[in-house]
């Protein structure tokens, strides 16, 4: 383990029996107040392009937990990648009564989507989000399934992310003002704020709030970043 106490770049050399190794190590200033905007359930031709436009206008990168794209929407996923966002997986499908039948079925649901993304875009995805989150109760028709999956998922090569800021854009939020208020009052300085939003079809509540949320965050000292495999994972308490 190598740690750095000062910001800067140094070069580390190592010598073996047959080879000499070199590694450039960069230590960056730690960012304390981070917002990770995440979008579930896309892509679709109505909402996703509008989200991408708003992010581009504000020079913000985000994370998209996608379902299997329709063939006509393959270009939207490509745009997500091309514009520097993190492509992540929500699953090949989202039907609770299917994906949580067993560990094997859930793993197949992720593997199938990852293989599709790799074949189509050359991107090997490792970030995932459970339909309903790891704290879901919709899987209780199969007692203990979430406990078993969350225990094993890292061994399958996946990192899973829940959220600690809920926009409620898919349920209790009645309008864009509600979404804005839910997000901005949920942000906490000194941590990584993982914000749950959705880019499903015609999510106008979220679209009406997104630009204002970004401007609020920047004004109040937050940095917007995409999730990566090295980001500290946010996990809920498992309820099944």
Tell me the role of every PLM-derived stretch.
Residues 1-30:
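Extracytoplasmic soluble-region selector
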Residues 8, 44, 202:
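Short acidic, S/G/P-rich loop/turn micro-motifs used as interaction or catalytic elements
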Residues 26-124, 216, 232:
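Active-site beta->alpha N-cap acidic-glycine motif
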Residues 72, 94-196, 200-223, 229-230, ...:
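Catalytic domains of cell-wall/extracellular-matrix polysaccharide-remodeling enzymes
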């Amino acid at each position: 383990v190598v740690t750095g106490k000062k910001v800067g770049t140094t070069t580390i050399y190592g010598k073996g029996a047959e080879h000499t190794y070199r590694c450039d190590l960069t230590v960056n200033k730690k960012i304390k107040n981070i917002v990770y905007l995440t979008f579930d359930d896309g892509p679709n031709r109505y909402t996703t392009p509008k989200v991408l436009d708003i992010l581009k206008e504000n020079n913000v990168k985000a994370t998209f937990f996608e379902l299997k794209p329709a063939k006509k929407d393959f270009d939207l996923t490509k745009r997500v990648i091309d514009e520097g966002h993190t492509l992540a997986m929500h699953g090949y499908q989202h039907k609770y009564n299917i994906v949580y039948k067993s560990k094997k079925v859930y793993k197949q649901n992720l593997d199938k989507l990852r293989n599709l993304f790799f074949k189509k875009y050359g991107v090997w995805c490792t970030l995932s989000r459970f339909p309903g989150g790891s704290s879901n109760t919709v899987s209780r028709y199969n007692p203990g399934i979430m406990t078993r999956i969350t225990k094993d998922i890292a061994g399958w090569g996946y990192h899973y992310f829940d959220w600690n800021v809920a926009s409620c854009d898919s349920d209790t939020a009645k309008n864009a003002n509600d979404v804005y208020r839910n997000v901005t009052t949920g942000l906490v300085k000194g941590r990584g704020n993982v914000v749950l939003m959705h880019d499903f079809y015609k999510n106008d509540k979220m679209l009406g709030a997104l630009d204002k949320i970004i401007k609020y965050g920047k004004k109040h000292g937050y940095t917007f970043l995409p999730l990566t495999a090295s980001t500290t994972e946010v996990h809920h308490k498992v309820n099944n």
